[in-house]
Structure formats: structure tokens, C-alpha cells
């Protein structure tokens, strides 16, 4: 009894001496586990502390006798916030999609689905259905393919996925072609033809304001021709990381580094093959996304040089789409040397496909990415080894060369000024070996380095021509106060061009059409032919202003053949023959090579660069044909026959270059029609009120592929419009016959017009 009293006294004293205890908080509902254990439950949601410590499921189920459950206020507040957030997101999504989904409500019947496959409302359905079924549509050849996994993603804090699917209306892109472009020169020829035949030039539309000499041409390019279709999705592989078989990859790498890798040596072959072998040995389980995109673009370029046209374009398109899926958006956010290499390869690829606008846009992105890396400043890579510095320099030099090529082809201002290239003028800055390698036979010659070095100096002359003769493709106005200025500029640039040709090393000398080595396919011979074609193409560019001046003078409206030309015009006429000479040598050299070996393994290199050179030369010959036929009171029969002979060779070149290529065939058709209308001798008797019908003229064309080329009631106006908007496929509707037998032309044929080399 005494012990119990002592314990009670201690308990009564303890509250006064110890810290005060907290009052136990009652909860309205305990979880099932705590009720079964009859232990204390703190009521935390979604799991109480006891269940968390024991690792059991915590469930709150009110009993049958429970009528009033007490829920914590913070839990209810959290639920209210989550519901409000969901409602807010749903309202935003409803506002965004309200305007896009409303036009699609009336076209849900089965007939519309079958008849309107190209409509904006139908495309998302196709894309979603095919995308969901693509893993099951791969062909049997995919069994031999490899799929890269474990891609190393570059750090990008802005890479957030936008999950909304939208349907956009059709848009058109207005593109400008300045004075240096082939399209602008063609406009001059057609204005002269309109003067000869008395046709009234078509009134320029909103998209074409080329009314005066030297003006640019602005055309509208419809963009729906490259929209995603069912066939495109079906031909593309299920994953952008898919790769062909090892044997095919090895073959494509060999083709690239033996062809395009020699002409554009900005990717180190040893480094690329070393990385490729490492990825191949680990089964491509770990690879950089940028490197894999660059590899696919290498495969695309190599596939473009294969023998079969059908296989070439199918495989090339597959590799291009994979590369775009890997690096298309990434190239706009990440800057690295591999991204710059990827963009250069995209530019080269787009020049040979129906993506000329993408070539120009990606080229601008490549320049800015290269400048962000400091490739334009040689001091930025002083901490790197000599090989890395060399390929950084080569990358920037190739970007400079492409800048001048595209500026000439599109007639637009160049992006890289010559002042930014002073530190690259030295020969050793773009060569991998010492200059002594040329004189010492014991030292192997760096053929790609030599070729890039001399090409760089050639394009510097081209840059001077663009600045002095074309006003850098800005609003160039002829210097009326000095009639000798064009002659002086042409003579000085021709002198520089010949000095460049005289300074070439022995293994890269300019070749002639009668040289026997043109039939022997070697890497050195191929580079000599390519360099010679570039040389004569620049000769055309230098002397084309004088040819344009001659044509402009001879075919002035109301002032034709009334008085002898002035002394300055006579000098311009004499110098204009140099333009024809360069065009003739271009056609003769290509004709000699392709006659000896019409396969892609000949000495011409990439077919689309050859196409550009021959097409440019054919336009010049057509201008000389117009001059000889209609520019004087007496027809120059010798010159007419000579021009027809050259155009006949050009036709054979187009046919042997690639018979199944729509881009080549479109060039053949265009030159055939232009030669046909330039060689017409008399104005047809049924020409009335500015309308020209040339069906009554049965004169053969210069190339012999057309007997008649009937136009509709618009006559000459339709043909002039055809050249003014070369990229619009609807212009073909103005002609009743195609001068190429057995050829059907499809939409989008002009969007990929040859754009330089």
C-alpha cells in the first residue's frame, strides 16, 4: 500500500516538474490498417506515418455507422487547386483549337475522305493513323538494319515538347531572284523575244514586278507540295535512329569520302571512321544525336551518287528524313562543329533535290552557327591540335565558297564579306600539308587540300565580280556616266581569272575538250574536270553583263536596226563573244566526258552541279542564237548553225545525265522551248493584237526534239510568264504539248531548279 501511494505522489508531482505534454489530437477516421492493429493513426493522406513506416497500403474506408467524416482543410484546399488548374488548361486548349476544328465539321462523310486527301482537314487523320501503325509496316529488308539506342542528348533547357496538333492553311513563299541569277537573264531574253514578235509583255502581277532591266524576279512558291503525305510516311522508317546494314553503311562511307568528301573536305575521314567503328562495335547503343544526324546526311549524299535513279531518290529521301528528325530542330538551338557540318551537308543535299529554298535558309543558319563557334577567327582554335584547327579552317572556307555560289545562283547578296577572309588568304591556311609537298615527290600530295585552296581563290574572283559587276545583287544601277566601266571591270576580272588559271599546280591544270584523260576515271582527273567547269562558269558570269548589254541594245522597242551601234556597243559585242566561248567549252567538256562514260562513276562529279553548269551555258547559247537570228538585218547563218549544234549537244547531255530525273527533264524541256522560240525566222501571219501562235511555224528546234510547240491564246505572254514564275507548275497548263516525248511533268517540278555549284 505504501508503494502505491508513493507512485501516486510522484505522478502528481511530475506534471509540475517536467515539460508540459501536448494534448492528443483526435481524428475523425483512422485507416483500415491502424484500426485492425488498434494503434494510433495520425490521419495523414494519402498515407499515414504508421503505414509508411511499415510499408503497407493505407486505405481510409468509413464504417457503416459513420455519418460525419472530418476531412482536413489543407487536403480539400489542395484538391480545389488541382481542379482549378485542370479547368484552366482545358479552357486554354479549347480556345486554341476552337478556330482550327470548326472548318472540319462538315467534311466527315466517306466520300470526302476519299476525294480530299490533300485537304488540310484530312492530313492529321492520315498522319495519326499511319504513325500509329508504322511499326507494323516495315518491309523485310528492315530485318538487316541496325537501330541506334542510348543517344546522348545535348543540354537544352528550352527543349519542351508541344503536344498540340494544329491544321494550318496553305501558305506561299515569295522568293526573289536578282541580277546574277539565270532566271533574271531569262527574263531579258523573253523581253527581247516579245519585241521581235510584237507581243505585248505580260503585266507584272503582285508576285512578279520584274519590269525593267536589272530588276529582280519575285515568285510565289506553293508550300503544299512538300506536305506530309501517306506515301511519305509509309516510305520513311519507323525510327530516326534506324540504320542500314553494316555492309551498306561501309559502302556509303567509301562512296562519300571518294567523291563529295574530296570536293568538300571539311569532315576528317579518320575521325569519322573511328567514331563509326566504336559505335558499330557497341551495337550503336550509345551515340551522339548530332553525330548520328551528320552520318545520315553523309549517307544521303552518297546515295545521291548511286547508279539507279529510283533507288537513289528513295534511299536518299529516307536518310534525309532521319537526319531531319534527329537534328532538324536541334540545329536551331545547339551550336557545335558537328551541327555546322550537318548544316553544310543539308545545303549540299538540297541543291540536288527539290528543296532549293531550304538550301538558302540552312546556309544562313550554317553561317551563324559557324560564327558562334568562332570559325571565322583563326585565333579561336589556338588551344586545339593542328588537325582540329585545319578542319575548322576548311569548314569556314567551304562555307565562304558556298556563300558565293548561292549568291550567284539566286541573285541575292552574299552573307560573308571578303574582309572577313583576309586571314585565310594564305595557301597554307587551307591545306593540310606543306606547300613543299608539290615540289617534293617523296611527300604525298594533299589532293583535297590543294583543290580547296585553288577553289577558294577562284571564288574570291567570283566575289569581286558580284561586287563590281552586279552591285552585290542589291539595287544595281548601270553607271551611265561611265560607259567604259563595264568593259573595264570585265577586262580586269578576266585578267585575274587567267592569272588564277596560270598559277594552278600541274595536277590541277584546266583541261580541254580534246584531252584524252577525260575518259580515264580517277580522283585527280575528276577534280580537274570539276575545277575546269567552275572556271568556265565564272567566265560566263564575268562576261554575261556585256552579253546582256548587247541584247538589251539590239532589241530595244522602237529602235531596232535603225542605226549602227555606237563604238561602246561594238566593244561590248566583241567582249560578249567571250561569254559564248566559256559556254561552248563547258558544253564540249561535259559532252566529251559523258559520251565516253555516261555512268555516275565518270569524271563529272555530282550530277546536279553538272546540270547547273550545262543549263547556264545553254541559256547563254540561246541568247547568242537570238542575237544571230533577230539582232541584225541579215541573219548570221554560221552563228545560228553553231548555236544549234551546241544546243543539240546540251540535249544529249541532259538525256545521258539522268533520263528518269524530273529535274533534269525539266531543264531539257525549258531549253528546248526557249531554243524553239529563239530560232523562229518569221512572225506568224495569224499574230494579232499582241497574241502569238507559233503552231504555224514548222521550223525544227535547235535540238531536234520538237516539231511544234503550240501555245494557247496568250501566246508569248504565257511563255514569258512561264519563265517569270519558273517554280509554279501551273504555268505548264499554258502549253498543249510537251517537247519531250513520253515525259509527264508533275507538280513541284520547278521548286528544285538547279541552284549553283
UniProtKB/Swiss-Prot annotation:
Subcellular location: Nucleus
Chain residues forming the annotated DNA-binding region: 31-58
One of the record's GO cellular component terms: nucleus
SMART domains to which the protein is assigned, alphabetical: Fungal_trans, GAL4
Compositionally biased intervals (Basic and acidic residues): 111-120
Region (Disordered) location: 1-24, 106-161, 202-222
Disulfide bonds: none
SUPFAM superfamilies: Zn2/Cys6 DNA-binding domain (SSF57701)
Induction entry: Expression is induced in response to 2-benzoxasolinone (BOA) exposure. Expression is also induced in response to 6-methoxy-2-benzoxazolinone (MBOA) and 2-aminophenol (2-AP) treatment.
Transcription regulation listed as a keyword: yes
UniProt function note: Transcription factor; part of the Fusarium detoxification of benzoxazolinone cluster involved in the degradation of benzoxazolinones produced by the host plant. Maize, wheat, and rye produce the 2 benzoxazinone phytoanticipins 2,4-dihy-droxy-7-methoxy-1,4-benzoxazin-3-one (DIMBOA) and 2,4-dihydroxy-1,4-benzoxazin-3-one (DIBOA) that, due to their inherent instability once released, spontaneously degrade to the more stable corresponding benzoxazolinones, 6-methoxy-2-benzoxazolinone (MBOA) and 2-benzoxazolinone (BOA), respectively.
Gene disruption: observed consequences: Reduces significantly the induction of the FBD cluster genes in response to 6-methoxy-2-benzoxazolinone (MBOA) treatment. Impairs the degradation of MBOA but does not affect the degradation of BOA and 2-aminophenol (2-AP).
Name the UniProt record assigns to this protein: Transcription factor FBD3
UniProt entry keywords in alphabetical sequence: DNA-binding, Metal-binding, Nucleus, Transcription, Transcription regulation, Zinc
Lineage: Eukaryota, Fungi, Dikarya, Ascomycota, Pezizomycotina
Gene: FDB3
Biased segments, Polar residues type: 125-135
GO biological process, one term: DNA-templated transcription
Molecular-function GO terms, alphabetical: DNA-binding transcription factor activity, RNA polymerase II-specific; RNA polymerase II cis-regulatory region sequence-specific DNA binding; zinc ion binding
Pfam family, one: Fungal_trans
Amino acid at each position: 500500500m505504501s508503494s502505491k501511494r508513493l507512485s501516486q505522489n510522484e505522478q502528481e508531482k511530475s506534471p509540475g516538474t517536467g515539460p508540459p505534454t501536448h494534448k492528443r489530437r483526435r481524428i475523425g477516421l483512422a485507416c483500415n490498417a491502424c484500426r485492425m492493429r488498434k494503434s494510433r493513426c495520425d490521419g495523414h493522406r494519402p498515407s499515414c506515418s504508421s503505414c509508411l513506416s511499415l510499408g503497407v497500403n493505407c486505405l481510409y474506408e468509413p464504417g457503416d455507422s459513420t455519418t460525419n467524416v472530418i476531412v482536413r482543410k489543407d487536403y480539400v484546399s489542395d484538391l480545389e487547386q488541382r481542379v482549378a488548374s485542370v479547368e484552366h488548361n482545358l479552357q486554354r486548349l479549347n480556345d486554341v483549337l476552337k478556330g482550327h476544328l470548326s472548318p472540319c465539321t462538315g467534311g466527315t462523310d466517306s466520300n470526302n475522305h476519299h476525294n480530299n486527301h490533300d485537304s488540310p482537314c484530312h492530313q492529321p487523320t492520315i498522319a495519326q493513323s499511319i504513325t500509329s501503325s508504322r511499326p507494323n509496316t516495315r518491309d523485310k529488308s528492315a530485318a538487316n538494319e541496325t537501330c541506334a539506342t542510348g543517344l546522348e542528348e545535348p543540354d537544352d533547357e528550352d527543349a519542351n515538347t508541344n503536344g498540340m496538333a494544329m491544321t494550318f492553311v496553305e501558305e506561299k513563299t515569295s522568293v526573289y531572284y536578282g541580277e546574277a541569277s539565270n532566271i533574271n537573264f531569262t527574263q531579258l531574253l523573253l523581253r527581247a523575244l516579245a519585241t521581235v514578235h510584237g507581243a505585248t509583255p505580260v503585266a507584272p502581277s503582285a508576285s512578279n514586278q520584274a519590269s525593267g532591266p536589272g530588276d529582280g524576279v519575285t515568285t510565289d512558291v506553293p508550300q503544299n507540295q512538300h506536305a506530309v503525305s501517306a506515301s511519305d510516311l509509309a516510305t520513311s522508317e519507323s525510327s530516326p535512329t534506324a540504320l542500314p546494314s553494316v555492309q551498306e553503311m561501309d559502302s556509303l562511307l567509301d562512296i562519300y569520302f571518294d567523291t563529295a568528301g574530296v570536293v568538300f573536305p571539311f569532315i576528317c575521314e579518320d575521325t569519322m571512321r573511328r567514331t563509326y567503328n566504336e559505335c558499330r562495335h557497341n551495337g550503336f547503343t550509345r551515340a551522339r544525336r548530332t553525330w548520328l544526324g551528320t552520318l545520315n546526311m553523309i549517307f544521303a549524299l552518297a546515295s545521291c551518287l548511286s547508279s539507279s535513279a529510283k533507288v537513289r531518290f528513295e534511299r536518299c529521301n529516307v536518310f534525309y528524313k532521319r537526319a531531319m528528325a534527329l537534328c532538324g530542330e536541334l540545329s536551331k538551338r545547339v551550336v557545335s562543329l558537328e551541327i555546322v557540318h550537318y548544316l553544310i551537308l543539308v545545303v549540299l543535299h538540297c541543291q540536288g533535290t527539290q528543296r532549293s529554298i531550304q538550301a538558302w535558309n540552312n546556309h544562313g543558319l550554317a553561317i551563324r552557327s559557324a560564327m558562334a563557334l568562332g570559325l571565322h577567327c583563326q585565333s579561336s582554335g589556338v588551344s586545339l591540335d593542328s588537325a582540329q584547327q585545319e578542319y575548322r579552317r576548311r569548314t569556314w572556307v567551304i562555307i565562304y565558297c558556298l556563300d558565293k555560289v548561292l549568291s550567284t545562283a539566286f541573285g541575292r547578296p552574299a552573307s560573308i564579306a571578303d574582309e572577313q577572309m583576309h586571314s585565310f588568304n594564305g595557301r597554307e591556311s587551307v591545306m593540310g600539308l606543306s606547300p613543299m609537298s608539290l615540289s617534293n615527290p617523296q611527300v604525298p600530295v594533299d589532293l583535297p587540300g590543294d583543290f580547296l585552296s585553288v577553289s577558294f581563290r577562284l571564288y574570291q574572283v567570283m566575289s569581286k565580280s558580284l561586287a563590281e559587276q552586279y552591285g552585290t545583287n542589291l539595287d544595281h544601277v548601270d553607271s551611265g556616266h561611265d560607259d567604259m566601266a563595264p568593259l573595264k571591270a570585265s577586262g580586269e576580272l578576266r585578267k585575274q581569272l587567267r592569272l588564277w588559271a596560270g598559277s594552278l599546280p600541274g595536277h590541277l591544270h584546266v583541261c580541254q575538250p580534246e584531252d584524252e584523260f577525260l575518259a580515264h576515271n580517277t580522283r585527280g582527273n575528276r577534280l580537274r574536270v570539276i575545277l575546269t567547269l567552275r572556271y568556265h562558269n565564272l567566265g560566263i558570269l564575268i562576261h554575261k553583263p556585256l552579253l546582256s548589254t548587247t541584247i538589251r541594245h539590239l532589241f530595244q522597242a522602237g529602235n531596232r536596226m535603225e542605226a549602227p551601234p555606237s563604238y561602246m556597243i561594238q566593244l561590248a559585242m566583241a567582249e560578249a563573244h567571250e561569254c559564248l566561248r566559256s559556254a561552248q567549252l563547258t558544253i564540249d567538256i561535259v559532252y566529251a566526258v559523258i559520251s565516253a562514260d555516261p555512268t555516275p562513276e565518270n569524271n563529272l562529279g555530282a550530277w546536279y552541279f553538272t546540270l547547273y553548269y550545262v543549263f547556264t551555258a545553254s541559256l547563254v547559247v540561246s541568247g547568242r542564237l537570238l542575237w544571230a537570228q533577230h539582232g541584225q538585218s541579215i541573219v548570221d547563218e554560221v552563228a545560228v548553225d553553231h548555236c544549234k549544234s551546241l544546243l543539240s549537244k546540251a540535249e544529249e547531255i541532259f538525256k545521258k545525265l539522268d533520263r528518269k530525273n524530273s529535274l533534269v527533264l525539266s531543264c531539257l524541256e525549258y531549253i528546248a522551248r526557249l531554243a524553239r522560240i529563239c530560232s523562229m525566222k518569221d512572225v506568224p501571219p495569224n499574230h494579232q493584237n499582241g497574241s502569238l501562235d507559233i503552231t504555224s511555224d514548222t521550223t525544227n528546234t535547235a535540238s531536234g526534239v520538237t516539231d511544234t510547240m503550240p501555245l494557247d491564246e496568250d501566246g508569248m505572254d504565257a511563255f514569258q510568264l512561264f519563265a517569270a514564275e519558273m517554280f509554279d507548275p501551273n504555268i505548264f497548263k499554258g502549253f498543249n504539248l510537251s517537247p519531250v516525248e513520253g515525259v509527264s511533268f508533275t507538280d513541284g517540278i520547278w521548286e528544285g531548279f538547279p541552284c549553283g555549284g
